[in-house]
């Protein structure tokens, strides 16, 4: 089910902030494999959707489909199960019991040489 307009705006802004913390670019290319969040880039200042993971800086995925990509790209889950099932996922943003949750995987942050701003440190596990 697609997100409601106000929820979409909030999720877009959060994903925008997370993405810019992970990737220090003004325009971040995103490959989206999550039907619920397909319009996320419409309300973002930095995210631009691309049609192939080989063009992307980051992939947003719900984990329902396997993604074959020739390029090394960051994987960010849009639900908890996808985060747990994908060892490549650097983090996740999802709602649980009506509350937003953010998680980052410490070992993958290190592997990609990513240091998050202090405001995100409490979400690292």
Give residue ranges: language-model regions:
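Short hydrophobic alpha-helices and adjacent helix-cap/hinge residues
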Residues: 1-125
């Amino acid at each position: 089910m697609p997100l409601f307009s106000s929820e979409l705006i909030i999720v877009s802004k959060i994903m925008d902030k997370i993405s810019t913390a992970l990737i220090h670019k003004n325009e971040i290319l995103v490959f989206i494999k999550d039907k619920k969040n397909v319009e996320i880039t419409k309300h973002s200042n930095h995210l631009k959707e691309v049609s192939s993971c080989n063009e992307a800086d980051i992939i947003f995925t719900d984990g329902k489909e396997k993604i074959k990509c020739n390029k090394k790209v960051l994987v960010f889950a849009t639900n908890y199960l996808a985060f747990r099932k994908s060892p490549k996922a650097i983090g996740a943003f999802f709602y649980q019991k009506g509350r937003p949750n953010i998680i980052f995987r410490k070992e993958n942050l290190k592997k990609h040489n990513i240091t998050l701003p202090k405001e995100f440190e409490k979400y690292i596990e």
